[in-house]
Amino acid sequence: MSPILTNRQAEELHKSIIAYLTANNLLNTANTLRAELNLSENAFDTATAKKYETLLEKKWTSVVRLQKKIMDLESRMSALQTELDNATPISLAKRNKDPASWIPTAPARHALESHRDTINSVAFHPIFSSIASGSDDCTIKIWDWELGELERTIKGHTRAVVDVDFGGPRGGILLASCSSDLSIKLWDPANEYKNIRTLLGHDHSVSAVRFIPLGASGAPSSGNLLVSASRDKSLKIWDVNTGYCVRTLQGHTAWVRDVYPSPDGRFLLSTGDDSTARLWDISVSNPESKVTMFGHDHFNECCALAPSSSYQYLSPLTGLKKPPAASSTAEFMATGSRDKTIKLWDARGTCLMTLVGHDNWIRALAFHPGGKYLFSVSDDRTLRCWDLSQEGKCIKVMRDAHERFITCLRWAPSIFKDTPTGHGAGDGRNGDSKKTEGPDVQIRCVIATGGVDMKLRIFAN
């Protein structure tokens, strides 16, 4: 008898094995085992065989499920232990007071519901407490993120609204949206979000839209130019005043999923289904892809340029003794892919590091305005924080941040007091200023996420 099992447990195991062998037509083996165990035919009749014939398989699958659950719990415990190790009472108190070190924590301040389908994108108003969300339900909704209230619903697109962004000329902030209906629309927040212009020219779904910053000294503000990315494999630059496409960038060989402008408006970072990221210098008359980054094993979903506040943490990875000047843009960047990884790159296209931890597609990235952290969201329903000062170590995992896939992430743009209409540099997806860059810059500790659960979640200090 096994020293681990009781007599009854051993008997059930023996009968289960015999029943399994019999059910799989291994009769000789079953009879031999029955004889070895001295089980008579009366002790193992038809009723007994029926009772035990699936028991072994059920117990086996139960063990496999239990093992997976144990592994998941061990992984979660390890992540929590890491977070605990990095969170002394002193460091927590300091982090909560210092915007440059603030990290979002659960629960969300607001979980806003009104959309009837997946939320694909979110964008903060650069001045007011308004936030826009675009959805597969073909609408854009404007919310007050401080009060957690719906302000209005904007209709106009005939298919899914894929991306939204605030920006525009100085003194005239606009909301831009793009859609699977092949169009880009401009809306005027000062006139009840009236549709003032529709931009047509792409031959397939438009997957991303961003205002291009002017890049003036001090706070970068958006100008008259807008960039869009499309499934037609191209990027287009538009003049929002005239509605004309002033430039088309060709180079990607498949769907372009995302685009991110540099704070000075000189560079664009794009990525997509050809598994590459491309850095474009649009300050020249005939821009071509300046650098092409290869390395991901699946389609790329998102990209982001690192703010200058991150240079001090990323420069050691390149062997530089001193970080590049803060005025130098597009020195470092990040890409997220369906291969479940995030890659960090330098301006030469060298992969500096691969961040592994997500269990599903990476859907959006956001650099902390303070420069120390990189945030990511994924179809694994988590929001993760990677510490760039610790060589990209994952220091926080917010599990079940949404009930289903998380599709978008955005950081509220910093406030530039001397330039109130500033869009916030490549707020692109997330904002990228740092309080220490100047006395007139204030980091807003607010992020928003959206997902397939049709909820817009606001995390704020």
From Swiss-Prot:
Key words, A-Z: Cell cycle, Cell division, Coiled coil, Cytoplasm, Cytoskeleton, Microtubule, Mitosis, Repeat, Transport, WD repeat
InterPro entries in the record: Dynein_regulator_LIS1, G-protein_beta_WD-40_rep, LIS1_N, LisH, PAC1-like_LisH-like_dom, WD40/YVTN_repeat-like_dom_sf, WD40_repeat_CS, WD40_repeat_dom_sf
WD repeats: 114-155, 157-197, 201-248, 251-290, 312-355, 357-396, 401-457
GO biological process: cell division; establishment of mitotic spindle orientation; microtubule sliding
Transmembrane intervals: none
Domain LisH: 9-41
GO molecular function: dynein complex binding
Gene Ontology cellular-component terms listed: cytoplasm; microtubule; microtubule associated complex; spindle pole; transferase complex
SMART domains named among the record's database cross-references: WD40
UniProt-annotated location(s): Cytoplasm, Cytoskeleton; Cytoplasm, Cytoskeleton, Spindle pole
Predominant localisation class: cytoplasm
The family this protein is said to belong to: Belongs to the WD repeat LIS1/nudF family.
Domains: entry comment: Dimerization mediated by the LisH domain may be required to activate dynein.
Function: Positively regulates the activity of the minus-end directed microtubule motor protein dynein. May enhance dynein-mediated microtubule sliding by targeting dynein to the microtubule plus end. Required for nuclear migration during vegetative growth as well as development. Required for retrograde early endosome (EE) transport from the hyphal tip. Required for localization of dynein to the mitotic spindle poles. Recruits additional proteins to the dynein complex at SPBs.
Subunit composition and interactions: Self-associates. Interacts with NDL1 and dynein.
Protein name: Nuclear distribution protein PAC1
UniProt organism field: Arthroderma otae (strain ATCC MYA-4605 / CBS 113480) (Microsporum canis)
